A protein has these predicted regions:
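Beta-strand-loop-alpha-helix segment that lines the small-molecule cofactor/substrate pocket
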Residues: 59, 63-64, 70-71, 75-122, ...
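Short, conserved SAM-binding/catalytic segment
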Residues: 41-47, 103-108
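Structural detector of well-ordered beta-strand residues that form the stable sheet scaffold
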Residues: 50, 89, 114-116, 146, ...
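Conserved SAM-binding strand-loop segment of SAM-dependent methyltransferases
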Residues: 47-53
Length: 228
């Protein structure tokens, strides 16, 4: 029986339902979120509620943690879990700076724990079906793949009630680039066994961004400038 702690109510509830459907032998023993209104929705008395993240990581009954917090918190939560010897399943991206990634990698090795980056798009039904067909040789000898993941996040980057930026909006404000590259290259890696066990690895990866102009347009539709 695996005792699981969850960080992040919204996606955390989804993962609980998925595990139940799969009939996996697990217990959700703890949940942390900084939104008190969401935590009050949890009716299961066996799940201990935490409003302080340090207290959450100090809870001795957690074997593994599912991290579904906003992007900027992923590395901090992962490092805290690793220091406690807790196995980790973390949403993407795992980190935002190379130095953070190296620190996490070294800590995982030192603590001898399991870490998995939850690149969910690899397991989308269409990608699983495509991988199966590729493995069967239905597309012959593949020498070139072009892929893209398109997710229009403009509508979920700010509140339409008060204009306040969501965590996605805050990320866009400080960084105009692709912070989810694994959504595009993850499935391709699965198709071609790139980076898996003793298989081939990417020699280089390039990402290009353009000036972001559409966000201001859609924002002004909801919150037009007041005329003097």
């Amino acid at each position: 029986m695996i005792n699981i702690g969850i960080i992040g109510y919204k996606r955390g509830v989804k993962i609980i339902n998925i595990l139940k459907k799969k009939k996996i032998n697990f217990n959700v023993v703890a949940m942390y979120d900084n939104d008190d209104a969401k935590l009050k929705l949890i009716k299961d008395k066996n799940i201990k509620i935490f409003r302080n993240e340090n207290s959450f990581f100090d809870y001795k009954y957690i074997d593994a943690v599912y991290i579904a917090s906003p992007v900027s918190h992923h590395i901090n939560h992962s490092i805290k879990a690793a220091k406690k010897g807790i196995h980790i399943l973390c949403e993407v991206p795992a980190f935002q700076k190379i130095a953070e990634g190296k620190k996490l990698k070294n800590l995982i090795k030192a603590k001898k724990i399991t870490y998995m980056m939850a690149e969910n798009y690899c397991y989308a039904p269409q990608n699983i079906a495509l991988k199966r067909s590729i493995k069967k040789g239905e597309f012959g000898n593949i020498t070139y793949i072009r892929s893209s993941y398109i997710h229009d996040c403009k509508d979920i980057s700010f509140s339409k009630k008060n204009g306040k930026l969501t965590w996605r909006g805050l990320e866009r404000k400080k960084f105009n680039g692709n912070d989810y590259p694994t959504h595009s290259i993850g499935p391709v890696s699965k198709f071609l066994n790139i980076g898996q066990f003793n298989s081939e690895k990417f020699s280089s990866i390039h990402s290009f961004g353009t000036k972001e102009i559409s966000m201001s347009d859609i924002y002004s539709k909801f919150f037009p400038k007041k005329k003097n």
